């Protein structure tokens, strides 16, 4: 896996790649139920132009933020993935949508590394926000789960529906 850099906005040149990543991603079928639930609960993501940059917002959730993973090399660097998240409730950063580029997925239809790196970046951000104790992932191939920001007792995550 190529090295990645993470940023909250990307240039307008990435608009087609981002549209494909968010709206036409072939792997969405593997987490379809979770995607549908997230859309019904929080609203649809949309790409917005801000000066010369692109951001992603979610219609029903003011305050959503996005983080993009770009290849550290290349001209231009390849868009590897994105994660859309928000603070909800006050002690949790909730990951609403997580997408990985078709080009970064391995032959066995998985690329856990870029997914793990995106989630880890959200976890690092959460550590810097006072009062945030959890990162909640709404959907994955194994269902919902929560990751503690400061693990206690050797447990690294809690699976199942959020309580």
Please annotate each region the language model reported.
Residues 1-30:
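Conserved N-terminal entry element of GNAT/NAT acetyltransferase domains
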Residues 22-26, 71, 122-130:
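Hydrophobic, Leu/Ile/Phe/Ala-enriched alpha-helical segments that form helix-helix packing faces
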Residues 30-51, 130-141:
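Short glycine-rich, low-complexity/disordered patches
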Residues 37-92:
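A conserved beta-strand-loop-helix scaffold within acyl/acetyltransferase catalytic domains
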Residues 42, 118-119, 158:
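Short, intrinsically disordered/low-complexity patches at protein termini
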Residues 88-152:
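Acyl-donor binding region in acyl/amide transferases
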Residues 152-163:
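Conserved catalytic-core motifs of GNAT/GCN5-like acyltransferases
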